[in-house]
């Protein structure tokens, strides 16, 4: 005789809808269990469901010969999005069986292991983000872990980068998904007629968000279909496209592929982000657990990179993860039903005690089941990782821990989630300490289809031994740990006289002008600490490195090579005998671009190593900055304050290191004078190359000054003027008359003109960077200059959130002064905060063979909405300046040599060339081709030339299309386009790397069977993509899958036959 299953009495038509809070359903259902016991019944969504909350009952339901998974409730509503996907199909639906057979291998142990590097890449982005934001930044824990896990599943499973950490807002898929999950939960407890008729507005919005999710999935599939060779690994997407049932040979339809793409994006990141969020809640509220977990990482990993080999050895962290999932299974319910084909119309559970009708849903409440005191004891609600160590975990009663589901319908991505969770936890504990943003925070549960902590925020602080300048190198095993200098030293007074200044030499290498500007700023800061610094190029110091004073070196690395004014110095230094610099005291600061991993900071590190080899004594740890962060000047200042000045014993000073200029403003006249650092060229023509509405790209022809020479591939350095609109803003702020004249006293440590009059207009237009983002020191100085408490507090907040509020928004000193009128600084003080105007470099787009007296440039005009939120336009300083030049105008220029190999080959008859570019990266190759035109007209039989060009549309921004077409007809070059917005006109290729892969036989023949030289010019993203596809062609040609072999071959190729020019 069976017993009646208890439960609260419902209302007509709507049943028990009012008994369940859709916003907090899991907690609500658990409370009902507390009232009605381990089994109860509710009428929800138009049907009666049974809810269980004991280990004994779920153990019975886990018998797959009697029961199977039932898709119901919110999960059934999710079928509106992904139909009969692997996650949402009923067990007897053919689509589930087919997808399961095809996709199981894609989640096997070897496949998951092969995803480690991509997981590590995404995890490193999170680590670097938290490091850069600093300990004052408030971290939305669930939000950032959601970005992490979404990007990881997208990259690992479908080779797609959502780049969530580089966007302020969530990816559209995530925002739509959250809306859909929330509404699916609400729809699950409402009768169908209520959903369809009463909530029509919600239904319309629901369908719109579903359409967004499906569109994104369709775009991913379409991209892969259009470029099937773009991804050579057998990722999940390729498995869905190419996989077949081993027995029937049947594959997944596009519709089924889209369904499963969506469900993997949902299930593959929602549950794991919740797990990590709950874990860090417990780590932060249990210091003893945190200490043990961090100690395990320190002892196992140390300061090296976390590797795949560490994953199986993080036993305590694994226990923490298990215990977290016990208390908070992020997929909090499993719904069962009697197995299809079961003969009886009904069955029983509970030892025959409770009757279950055919197809009736039985919901296992995992939060309650996994806290069953019969299994876990009286402390079942406490977080105790020790109960989840391997030996104890393996001896637990069957089916008492089921966060990944049951049997054959269990989570197919369990191994993926586990590896990802172990990796990110280890990396975060290795590098950070954490604290709650609100010390009084009490755990809140936020529920959609899964559960996460609600309103959970924390702070992350780099551990004492972690050097933020070398963090990224450490993550990837490319840098050694830097030392930490403690304790301030007494500083020099600003009142130091010229006679009291100690000597210092600052040596720099610079082609773009950035490091030169940094060297000048360091000299100004040095004066405030008692040093009179001499600033020189590195080449000028050959055989002249002083031994009686500190020597500070500031240098970049250009694709692993020294800048042009440091080449001789590097050669000289490498040839020195050991101990040749025995009495030299030095320190090095380097600039680099992290996109070039193999050559990142090569020259600064080489300089440091060679000085040490030659017996010099290092003053302070080498500083390494990354220009891609966009805050290189603030990083440089931070290195000075944290490393250089404390090591020299002048950590602090009585005043500001950036001495204010005692400028006398003469309002009576306008004797204007402009200092010229380069020779004057004359504009012959200036034309727009793109159609209206497209990003503006231009082409200018310049008559060079007499005697100025260049080679194809060289750069032209242009000294620009600030836009008059920006200059006018300064005049308005400073309340200067338009003909004001200023004088900077002679002897002031600056690169600006001193000891003579100069018009304020000329000074502001041509000598200082008005749009450069403010530095941290600028903010502190501005705050100290305001008598207004509100302004001081506001500026303090800006400084606390510097990366997000200043650097990312590119707020200049002028922007801040306009926003906070209470700041009271002089015009001279304002000028002292600004770095000097620096030249910008552009690849020359012509050949001197055609006309040695002229040079042409091709560039994109930067004109976009300002990140500051001011409503103004952000105008690129030099690109805007060049765009405004007209015939007859004069512009200050100088030639800068390209990298040694970035020129047409000296033996063009025997060496083919392959050129790849995106956008205005075409510039140097136009020069190459113009040179070939001249050579062919001279009767030379040249080796083949191939040009791969990436742009948007053949009619709107295919630059110099007619000229190139004529050259192709003349046999000068064979051109292969990739149109991102018209790929049907470029063999289905959207990007230059796609076209290279499409023509890989040509590239293979040139690089492997011939002696072609490969040139690449474009942005860092395109450069990396082209590099990757060339390596892929190598692996495809050799039949090798080893990344190390491809990397070794590629490094050899770069020595002589692969050359790149990357622009910002």
UniProtKB/Swiss-Prot annotation:
One Pfam family, short name: NAD_binding_1
Disulfide cysteine pairs (residue numbers): none
Molecular function as annotated in GO: aromatase activity; flavin adenine dinucleotide binding; FMN binding; heme binding; iron ion binding; NADPH-hemoprotein reductase activity
Induction conditions: Expression is induced on AF medium.
Chain residues that bind heme: 411
Disruption phenotype: Impairs the production of ascochlorin and ascofuranone, and leads to the accumulation of ilicicolin A.
Bound cofactor: record note: Binds 1 FAD.
Known EC number: 1.14.14.-
PANTHER family named in the record: BIFUNCTIONAL CYTOCHROME P450_NADPH--P450 REDUCTASE (PTHR19384:SF127), NITRIC OXIDE SYNTHASE-RELATED (PTHR19384)
Protein name per its UniProtKB record: Bifunctional cytochrome P450/NADPH--P450 reductase ascE
Species the sequence originates in: Acremonium egyptiacum (Oospora egyptiaca)
Gene designation: ascE
């Amino acid at each position: 005789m069976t017993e009646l299953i208890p439960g609260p009495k419902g209302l007509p038509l709507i049943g028990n809808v009012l008994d369940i809070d859709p916003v907090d359903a899991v907690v609500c259902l658990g409370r009902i269990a507390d009232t009605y016991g381990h089994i109860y019944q509710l009428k929800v969504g138009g049907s009666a469901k049974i809810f269980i909350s004991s280990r004994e009952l779920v153990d019975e339901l886990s018998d797959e010969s009697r029961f199977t998974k039932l898709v119901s409730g919110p999960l059934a509503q999710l079928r509106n999005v992904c139909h009969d996907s692997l996650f949402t199909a009923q067990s007897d639906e053919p689509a589930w069986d087919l997808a399961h057979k095809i996709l199981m291998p894609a989640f096997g142990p070897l496949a998951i292991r092969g995803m480690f590097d991509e997981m590590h890449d995404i995890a490193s982005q999170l680590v670097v983000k938290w490091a850069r934001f600093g300990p004052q930044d408030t971290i939305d824990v669930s939000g950032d872990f959601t970005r992490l896990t979404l990007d990881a599943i997208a990259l690992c499973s479908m080779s797609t980068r959502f780049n969530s950490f580089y966007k302020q807002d969530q990816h559209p898929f995530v925002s739509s998904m959250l809306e859909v999950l929330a509404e699916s939960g609400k729809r699950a407890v409402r009768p169908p007629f209520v959903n369809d008729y009463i909530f029509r507005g919600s239904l319309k919005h629901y369908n719109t968000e579903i359409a967004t999710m499906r569109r994104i999935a369709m775009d991913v599939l379409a991209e892969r279909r259009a470029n099937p060779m773009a991804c050579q690994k057998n990722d999940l997407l390729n498995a869905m496209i190419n996989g077949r049932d081993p027995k029937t040979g049947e594959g997944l339809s596009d519709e089924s592929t889209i369904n499963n793409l969506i469900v993997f994006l949902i299930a593959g990141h929602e549950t794991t982000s919740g797990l990590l969020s709950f874990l860090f809640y417990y780590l932060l509220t249990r210091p003893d657990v945190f200490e043990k977990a961090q100690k395990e990482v320190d002892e196992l990993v140390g300061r090296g990179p976390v590797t795949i080999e560490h994953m199986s050895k993080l036993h305590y962290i694994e226990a923490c993860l298990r215990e977290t999932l016990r208390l908070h299974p992020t997929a909090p319910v499993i719904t069962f039903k009697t197995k299809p084909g079961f003969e009886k119309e009904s069955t029983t559970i509970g030892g025959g005690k409770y009757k279950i009708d055919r197809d009736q849903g039985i919901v296992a409440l995992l939060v309650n089941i996994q806290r069953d005191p019969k299994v876990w004891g009286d402390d079942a609600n406490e977080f105790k990782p020790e109960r989840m160590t391997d030996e104890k975990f393996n001896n637990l009663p069957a089916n008492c821990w089921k966060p990944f589901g049951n049997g054959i319908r269990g989570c197919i991505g369990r191994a993926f989630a586990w590896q990802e969770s172990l990796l990110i936890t280890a990396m975060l504990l290795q590098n950070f300490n954490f604290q709650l943003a609100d010390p009084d925070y009490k755990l809140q549960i936020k529920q959609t289809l899964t559960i996460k902590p609600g309103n959970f925020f924390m702070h992350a602080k780099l551990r004492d031994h972690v050097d933020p300048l070398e963090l990224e190198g450490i993550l990837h095993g490319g840098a050694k740990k830097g030392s930490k200098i403690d304790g301030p030293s007494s500083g020099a007074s600003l009142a130091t006289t010229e006679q009291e200044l100690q000597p210092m030499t600052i040596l720099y290498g610079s082609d773009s002008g950035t490091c030169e500007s940094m060297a000048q700023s360091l000299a100004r800061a040095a004066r405030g600490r008692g040093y009179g610094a001499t600033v020189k190029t590195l080449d000028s110091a050959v055989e002249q490195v002083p031994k009686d004073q500190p020597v500070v070196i500031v240098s970049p690395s250009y694709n692993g090579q020294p800048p042009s004014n440091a080449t001789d110095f590097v050669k000289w230094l490498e040839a020195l005998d050991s101990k040749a610099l025995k009495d030299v005291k030095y320190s090095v600061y380097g600039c680099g671009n992290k996109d070039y991993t193999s050559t990142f900071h090569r020259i600064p590190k080489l300089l440091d190593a060679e000085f040490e080899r030659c017996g010099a004594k290092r003053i302070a740890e080498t500083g390494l900055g990354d220009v891609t962060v966009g805050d290189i000047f603030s990083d440089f200042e931070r290195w000075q304050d944290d490393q250089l000045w404390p090591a020299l014993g002048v950590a602090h000073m009585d005043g500001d290191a950036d001495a204010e200029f005692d400028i006398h403003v003469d309002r009576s006249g306008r004797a204007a004078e402009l200092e010229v650092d380069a020779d004057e060229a004359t504009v012959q023509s200036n034309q727009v190359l793109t159609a209206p509405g497209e990003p503006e790209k231009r082409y200018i022809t310049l008559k060079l000054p007499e005697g100025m020479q260049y080679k194809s591939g060289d750069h032209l350095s242009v000294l620009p003027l600030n836009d008059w609109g920006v200059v006018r803003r300064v005049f308005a702020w400073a309340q200067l008359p338009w003909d004001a004249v200023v004088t900077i006293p002679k002897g002031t440590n600056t690169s600006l003109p001193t000891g003579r009059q100069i018009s304020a207009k000329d000074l502001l237009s041509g000598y200082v960077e008005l749009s450069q983002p403010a530095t941290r020191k600028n903010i502190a100085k501005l705050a100290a200059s305001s008598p207004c408490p509100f302004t001081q507090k506001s500026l303090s907040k800006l400084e606390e959130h510097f990366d997000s509020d200043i650097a990312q928004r590119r707020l200049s000193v002028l922007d801040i002064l306009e926003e906070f009128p209470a700041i009271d600084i002089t015009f001279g003080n304002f000028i002292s905060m600004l770095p000097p105007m620096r030249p910008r470099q552009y690849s020359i787009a012509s050949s001197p063979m055609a006309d040695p007296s002229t040079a042409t440039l091709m560039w994109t005009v930067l004109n976009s909405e300002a990140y500051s939120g001011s409503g103004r336009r952000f105008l690129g300083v030099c690109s805007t300046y060049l765009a405004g030049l007209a015939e007859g105008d004069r512009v200050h220029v100088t030639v800068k040599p390209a990298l040694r190999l970035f020129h047409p080959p000296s033996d063009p008859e025997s060496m083919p060339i392959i050129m790849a570019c995106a956008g205005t990266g075409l510039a140097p190759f136009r020069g190459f081709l113009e040179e070939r035109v001249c050579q062919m007209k001279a009767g030379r039989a040249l080796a083949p030339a191939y040009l791969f060009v990436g742009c948007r549309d053949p009619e709107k921004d295919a630059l110099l299309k007619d000229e190139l077409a004529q050259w192709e007809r003349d046999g000068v070059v064979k051109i292969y386009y990739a149109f991102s917005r018209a790929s049907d006109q470029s063999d289905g290729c959207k990007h230059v790397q796609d076209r290279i892969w499409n023509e890989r036989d040509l590239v293979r023949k040139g690089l492997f069977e011939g002696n072609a030289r490969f040139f690449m010019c474009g942005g860092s993203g395109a450069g990396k993509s082209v590099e990757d596809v060339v390596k892929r062609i190598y692996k495809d040609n050799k039949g090798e899958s080893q990344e190390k072999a491809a990397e070794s071959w590629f490094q050899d190729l770069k020595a002589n036959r692969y050359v790149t020019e990357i622009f910002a």
